[in-house]
Regions:
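Structured alpha-helical
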Residues: 1-119
């Protein structure tokens, strides 16, 4: 049984990943929680997100900004850090990130969205 601080919901949302060099990638969101989001990407995009082309664990800090339009009233814009990385196939990778520095109002809106399963 998975024990989590916050529920995780499956989503079908675009996640805009904004890198420090100005590149923006729109990737399909897989799931969302109070704490973070996960998405999949191909090998080429992975090479852009990870400076060394791979992620070796939490000590390997990889941060970027996210923008996720959750609905017409709420777009989540925040900094994030990679917390999970999984190779799914030769050209597909799963990346999990944790949100950083959410203010109280944004955190409240996110909790409301997740608890309402995005409705």
């Amino acid at each position: 049984m998975e024990r989590r601080f916050s529920p995780r919901i499956e989503v079908n949302l675009d996640v805009d990943v904004l890198l420090a060099d100005g590149q923006v990638f729109t990737l399909p969101g897989i799931d969302l929680s109070y704490m973070g989001v996960s998405f999949n990407c191909n090998y080429w995009t992975l090479q852009q997100i990870f400076p060394d082309g791979n992620w070796s664990g939490p000590r390997d800090k990889v941060n970027f900004t996210l923008s996720i339009k959750l609905n017409d009233e709420f777009t989540l814009d925040c900094d994030s850090t990679v917390t999970r990385f999984l190779r799914l196939s030769e050209d597909e990778y799963h990346i999990g990130v944790q949100f950083l520095g959410l203010d109280d109002e944004t955190q409240h809106d996110l909790i409301h969205f997740v608890n309402g399963a995005g409705k």
